[in-house]
Amino acid sequence: MKPRHIPVFDGHNDALTRLWLSDHPDPVHAFIHERLVGHLDLKRCQEAGFIGGMFAIFLPPYSYVQQHHSNKLFDQNASDFTQQQIEQICLEQLDLAHQLAQYSKNIKICTSVQDIQDCRAEKKLAIVLHMEGAEALQQNPDLLDVFYERGLRSIGPLWNRPSRFGHGLNAKFPHSPDTGAGLTSDGKDFIKRCANKKMVIDVSHMNEKAFWNTVDILQQPIVATHSNSHALCPQARNLTDPQLKAIRESKGMVGVNFDVAFLRSDGQRNADTSIDVILEHLEYLMDRVAPLLHPRSKLRKGTHKRTPGRAGDAD
């Protein structure tokens, strides 16, 4: 008898970026019909009761692409992506998401809660499109409308890099989340535009000043899709108790990040880490954010080191 799986809706994964980086001649076909290298593909989602999640459109650091996927570079002699290239990369990942839905009757891009509920009932994989770091939208304001019309419903305005919208957040350990300036005036206006579209605003990669800027702007639940407790792991990426209190007061939620460097009290990226460490963060967050609502979101594909005993989503 197969084990019965609890339905999982994942708060954050990097599957689209991995497909964009893939050397496979047909990564969309591979995701649908094969077992891809990494943690996430359709078959393992179905085996694990993985009903869907927030699929991130993300610009990988230039240095990472240069070192590991140099065939994806537009100019081998450049030192960074141009704005036009940033926009193209993100649009290509958006196209990959639509190809997944086009070529599989078991995958759907969802733009509403009802869509997600329908996918669960029909045993389809629900893709909610998210953008992690909004650099692709910083020069051409109309691009937000383009991405929205094609299904984007969640956005993390900042990543670790500085942009027109704000300072970003360096993942320092040990360190407080106060790593620099907060949102720029353009960043505040951008968040207001996204909020007017009823989009989810993800604070997971915001430094402390940007976080509080966002709290002051939003009249909606505050969401951190993949962040942990700073009290348990003093990593700048994690959330302090006052931040958790603000999220609770907004009726928001926090998803646990499975990257062990953001879980362990010593900040080490050591895969030999007990699952008990995850449970400790989960219990801490539930107690402080939503004792009656237990979000179990995970940073999956894209994590450098995961806890042992898990080869992928089926585990």
UniProtKB/Swiss-Prot annotation:
This is Uncharacterized protein in PQQ-III 3'region. Belongs to the metallo-dependent hydrolases superfamily. Peptidase M19 family. It comes from Acinetobacter calcoaceticus. Residues 296-308 have a biased composition (Basic residues). The lineage of its organism: Bacteria, Pseudomonadati, Pseudomonadota, Gammaproteobacteria, Moraxellales. It comes from the Bacteria. GO terms for molecular function: metallodipeptidase activity. Residues 296-315 are annotated as: Disordered. One of its GO terms (biological process) is proteolysis. InterPro entries: Dipep_AS, Metal_Hydrolase, Pept_M19.
